[in-house]
């Protein structure tokens, strides 16, 4: 089989918005100052991902010379997030629970004020992508998703793009995560003959930040197709170029 082409784009839920920026900026700044300190874990500063890059990846796509990108953008614009979530919640409601509500005489009242966001995310903890924490190259925070609604929503989005032939089908479950540390961005380290990623002993970091809350109850505002390779911004931050996005409403 020919090798799979390198990914050029990804579908994601961006995590940085007007509501989350202050929370994430404070959390990431404190984390950065701690783990990069020579008196603490002495992690190379380049390994800590910039604020503007934080997102939840749904899937990656390959569009050499941008071939197929137009189709992906068109598909994105046909999505109706509210309808997708309504279908998920309808499937979650069992006949037994629906019957119990009717017996109690529960009725749905019209909410006062602005409607609640369709999806909100709390980002918590720190985990190693590698099975051995003492030789980690990627550390990530997980969204709190007790009912599994966020995961099912993202799985529906991924399936839509896979069925259209725009995203490769992977034989592994979707792991929603926000990358906090990735040592691939550390320059000038000897990576050996095979150009392997440098690794860190993350055991102490994982112990310290296992219950750390990065942001809490932040509304998800967009679904986006972004281009691989974060770009430097005028304010010194980094961010991925957005090819197309839709509102989560």
Indicate residue ranges for each PLM-predicted region.
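Histidine-dependent nucleotide/RNA phosphoesterase domain, centered on the 2H-phosphoesterase fold
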Residues: 1-249
């Amino acid at each position: 089989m020919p090798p799979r082409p390198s990914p050029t784009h990804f579908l994601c839920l961006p995590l940085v918005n007007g509501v989350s920026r202050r929370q994430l900026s404070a959390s990431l700044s404190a984390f950065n100052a701690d783990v990069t300190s020579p008196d603490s874990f002495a992690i190379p500063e380049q390994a800590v991902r910039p604020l503007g890059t934080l997102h939840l990846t749904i899937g990656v796509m390959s569009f050499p010379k941008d071939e197929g990108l137009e189709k992906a953008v068109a598909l994105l614009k046909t999505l109706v997030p509210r309808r997708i979530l309504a279908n998920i919640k309808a499937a979650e409601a069992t006949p037994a629970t629906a019957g119990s509500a009717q017996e109690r005489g529960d009725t749905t009242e019209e909410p006062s004020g602005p409607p609640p966001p369709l999806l909100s995310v709390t980002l918590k903890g720190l985990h190693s992508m590698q099975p051995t924490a003492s030789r980690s190259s990627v550390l990530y925070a997980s969204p709190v998703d007790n009912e599994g609604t966020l995961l099912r929503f993202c799985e529906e989005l991924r399936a839509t793009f896979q069925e259209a032939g725009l995203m490769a089908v992977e034989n592994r479950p979707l792991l929603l995560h926000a990358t906090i540390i990735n040592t691939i961005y550390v320059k000038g380290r000897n990576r050996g003959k095979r150009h392997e990623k440098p690794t860190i002993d993350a055991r102490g970091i994982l112990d310290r930040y296992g219950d750390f809350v990065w942001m809490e109850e932040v509304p998800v505002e967009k679904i986006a197709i972004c281009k691989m390779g974060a770009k430097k911004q005028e304010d010194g931050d980094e961010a991925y170029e957005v090819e197309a996005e839709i509102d989560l409403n």
